[in-house]
Curated annotation (Swiss-Prot):
Function: Binds to 23S rRNA. One of the proteins that surrounds the polypeptide exit tunnel on the outside of the ribosome.
Coiled coil (UniProt feature): none
Keyword vocabulary terms for this entry: Ribonucleoprotein, Ribosomal protein, RNA-binding, rRNA-binding
Species of provenance: Methanospirillum hungatei JF-1 (strain ATCC 27890 / DSM 864 / NBRC 100397 / JF-1)
Listed name of the protein: Large ribosomal subunit protein uL23
Family named by the database record: Belongs to the universal ribosomal protein uL23 family.
């Protein structure tokens, strides 16, 4: 499984409201293309950009931007986070 879980912190919530970006913890070996395809397939929303980083605990975090500005809030409400 490429997507492990959504990264839900106070800072991540501010980024959703400000930029419309979602953050996910993903498999360390997943590429940006694989992450994009997995998110588009799971949530039926077109992804415009995927940025990744490795945190100090060895987890890979993906920041995902959507073409629809309200897509991130819609996805979080479907997941029951927001």
């Amino acid at each position: 499984m490429i997507l492990k879980y959504p990264y839900a912190t106070e800072k991540a919530s501010m980024i959703v409201e400000r930029d419309g970006q979602l953050q996910f913890i993903v498999d360390r070996k997943a590429s940006k293309g694989q992450i994009k395809v997995a998110i588009e397939k799971m949530f039926d929303q077109p992804v415009t950009r995927v940025r990744t980083l490795m945190n100090n605990r060895g987890e890979k975090k993906a920041m995902v931007s959507f073409s629809n500005p309200k897509a991130a809030e819609e996805i979080l409400s479907r997941l029951g986070i927001m």
